[in-house]
Amino acid sequence: MQRFILRRFFYMLVTMLCASVLVFALSRLTGDPRLLYAQEGGYGITPEQWEALGKQLGLDKPYPVQYGNWLVRAFKGDLGRSMLDRKPVTEVVGERIFNTFQLALGAWLFATLVGVPLGVLSAVKRASIWDYFGRSFALLGQTLPVFWIGIMGILIFAVKLGWLPSGTKPDYISVKHFIMPCIALGWFSAAGYMRLTRSAMLDVLDSEYIKLARAKGVSGSLVVWKHAFRNAIIPPLTFSGLILAGFVTGAVVIETVFAWPGLGRMAYTSVTQNDFPVMAGVVLLFTGIFLIVNFLVDVSYAYIDPRIRYG
């Protein structure tokens, strides 16, 4: 296990370095960051100001030197200042990260509490109306795009019926403001949970030891939840960790549709406005979250399934 952990930490470090190189290269391909300053106010800047600004931002040095200086500061927690807000990137990200985590957690809870039980029910009641309902839910959930679900939810429940707010997030905790964004973001994953849980449960329910347990007179609920579900939960567990990380890193569309003040919407704005410090900070944060969650899921295998061992 120790060798596995050390190896994974090494891979995580290499991945973060590759992500930093990619982000830095793409930021330079999109244009000189000084152009953003030149466009402010609509009057531009003089050549002397252009050169002075380049020295201030370190843009007068070769690209490898620029990257090295930026990487050293990033490892120290200094990602620079936002070119739009004129605030430190850590402060700008800190203002939005809690909103994104709230949205991701709500979507994950919806997907888990709907998809997993529905998958178990569909497997236990195979070829019944519950099975057909579950498979239809999975089909619709994985074919309808999330932005369409969000837009239709706003049109029906906010505009037509007036039951729920159409978007934005107040400063206080409001359950009504979470309902539509969380359902829209978690719908696709709930369908994935359902299909994965159903498939895993069917494989386990058809195994010999389950048939033996039933032959010994073990109650149906005990067979399903103690014996079958425990062994069928590993594939959904893998999916769970990756999906939770995906909610955090991939909520750009939903945050844009519902005007949610989170990291996804901020990442989109930083890309369109060429705000490199914020864009780099968000991408590195997203990469780190995904790698850490994936690592924790892999480690949890050994504790859930004793058959799995890491060398």
Identify the meaning behind each predicted range:
Residues 21-30, 57-58, 72, 136-165, ...:
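Membrane-water interface segments at the C-terminal ends of transmembrane alpha-helices
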